[in-house]
Amino acid sequence: MDLENKMKKMGLGHEQGFGAPCLKCKEKCEGFELHFWRKICRNCKCGQEEHDVFMSNEEDRKVGKLFEDTKYTTLIAKLKTDGIPMYKRNVMILTNPVPAKKNVSINTVTYEWAPPVQNQALARRYMQMLPRNKQPVAGSEGAQYRKKQLAKQLPAHDQDPSKCHELTPNEVKQMEQFVKKYKNEALGVGDVKLPSEMDVKPGDRSSLDGGDRGTTAEVGAVEDKSSADKKEDYSCYCCKQSMKEGDPAVYAERAGYDKFWHPACFICNTCSELLVDMIYFWKNGKLFCGRHYCDSEKPRCAGCDELIFSNEYTQAEDQNWHLKHFCCFDCDSILAGEIYVMVDNKPICKPCYVRNHAVICQGCHNAIDPEVQRVTYNNFNWHATEECFLCSCCSKCLIGQKFIPIEAMLFCSVECKKMMMS
């Protein structure tokens, strides 16, 4: 019965988002179909985050599980039905005040996430300081960006063994210990405040609880009540530029409250992307997203994208691979001991390379085997043989000789060129 339930869960996982269009490949993709272990679409090879898959509840569960058994439990709520922790992200709805007139609709803007602060004017100013294409306004490019970063920065398979492929009991135990360790030592959530508010060290930090799941506020101005008493030159820990008076800053408790960042500077040290929902990992004086923090601690399989907890794994092409996952990216055949070619940083077996990726010889019009020599000029290729790399007029072999190129044609002399072109 347990096996049946596990198989059912696995099936449901692979059905999620099935058929969703790819936002990157458009009509070239037949629709999302999850590869059995690669975590990409079998049709177009793009990740699930590149497809138009509705993942709101799934992402809230993932972040909820991340915050479980941490000091950030105020940001989650457990469902009464199954006890699954759900992320209580703060949804902010801003209402622009308009003159009292008849038949005038109220202009509202909904942010799918906003910093959980009580001063909503401060939260609004925080949003204004982000690049417009990264502001998570519902239905916008920024909302799509946030969704993509949730998938990229916080992979479910970096924290939940059940999301991984065929872990041994020992690997499950190692992963659970690893997750517990980074929750205790590195995980944090940014806090938004005015720098001047931090002149006095807080004896009791303001609660991280975002309150109700949805918050409505009127647009107003940010008011810094303490700025009149004392003005300081505050500089961003990332860009070293000064903070403008009245502008909010982001703090990371694990970094210490003497450090703060512009909202747009609160980024991962490796990928330089905004830390999604201000969720960070602190290590050696640097901010990381979840993915790149884990990469700094454990090898990651370039095949399945999971962290490697086994003592035995393969290293090839400056990447790490589970032994069973060093496979052809096109056909999944094992490549150990086989000839392969790297295409876009992915290993391809020789038959698939010749069939799908090989360049075509302009001389014989056949695919060029990856193991044979070839001549390349601009975007044209030839076998480096007497039969293929020759003058288009007199058929003289041009290997080691000067030649005159005209598109895909080659000439040994001006005379041959004139004769052929006349």
From Swiss-Prot:
Residues 135-162, 194-226 are annotated as: Disordered. GO terms for cellular component: cytoplasm; focal adhesion. Gene3D superfamilies: Cysteine Rich Protein (2.10.110.10). Residues 234-297, 299-359, 362-422 form the LIM zinc-binding domain. The keyword Nuclease does not apply. This is Testin. Scaffold protein that may play a role in cell adhesion, cell spreading and in the reorganization of the actin cytoskeleton. Plays a role in the regulation of cell proliferation. May act as a tumor suppressor. SMART domains: LIM. The lineage of its organism: Eukaryota, Metazoa, Chordata, Craniata, Vertebrata. Pfam families: LIM, PET. The gene is TES.
